Amino acid sequence: MSEEPRTLLKPVSPYPALLIESGSEKFLTISDIHLGWEANLAGEGVHVPSQTNKLLRRLERIISLVKPDCLTILGDIKHTIEKIELEEWRDVPIFFESLLRKISCIKVIPGNHDGNIEVLLPEGVEVAPQQGIVIGGAGLFHGHTWPDIKLLGCETLIIGHIHPTVTFKDPMGFRITSQVWVRAPCDRPTLVRSTLKHYNVRLKRDDDPEEILRAKFSIEPKVRSLIVMPSFNDFLGGRAINRASISRDVIFKDFIGPVLRSGSVDLERAEIYLLDGTFIGTLNKLSMLE
Ligand SMILES: [Mn+2]
């Protein structure tokens, strides 16, 4: 059997961006841009200038810095879900046409906000399946759907969708909110069992789901952890994952997406990192002071 090239995951500190190095190839990965988000606020009487240019300049800076071969975006390019707002008709094509002048390989994995995204993307931008893609030992998908079965052969699953933040109160009573990275251990047999079940693969009570995956799909199950990326658009609201006022169960139910709801991801023991790389503890130690 040929040796797989090593896959290295490097957060591009202090940005909400991840560099995936697989063999000699470099993939820059970001998630949740939500272009047109501020236009939605205008409907509520709050007027915020368009963030598109700021986000574009920031992304171009990161591309110049790390010189990736390819840019992968884990979904939620635009903000409105089904229909397309006027601002998105304008901003989404401009955003990607400018990016294509910097980098010729761009892959988009659609998120739940990306209905009809194809019509907004210029030629040259590849739209991948919602069930995700494999880059070396990393499986990438947005997080609102089940991943493709082949992603179970990756050591690390990487999703967006949740926009994780932590919130603390300082001694003066001020609230501080920071975007964070989440890296949670996975219970592999449970994840394999629930994914196979989703794809209607029949399992008897004492079947070993990992054996079935090997036998029926020729996939060696390898998933060990799941990474939740911070949103690239830092202007958005986030999900304070350390809220103590409601029970953990409620928070977990609130974690939208079938993989997080399946009970196979141990969020209690998830490691939480700030964007500058500081490890601030595991989630069960980070209750918010209220
Ligand atoms: Mn989403």
Task: For the regions a language model picked out, list residue spans one by one.
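Extended recognition/assembly regions associated with phosphoester-bond processing machinery
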Residues: 1-290
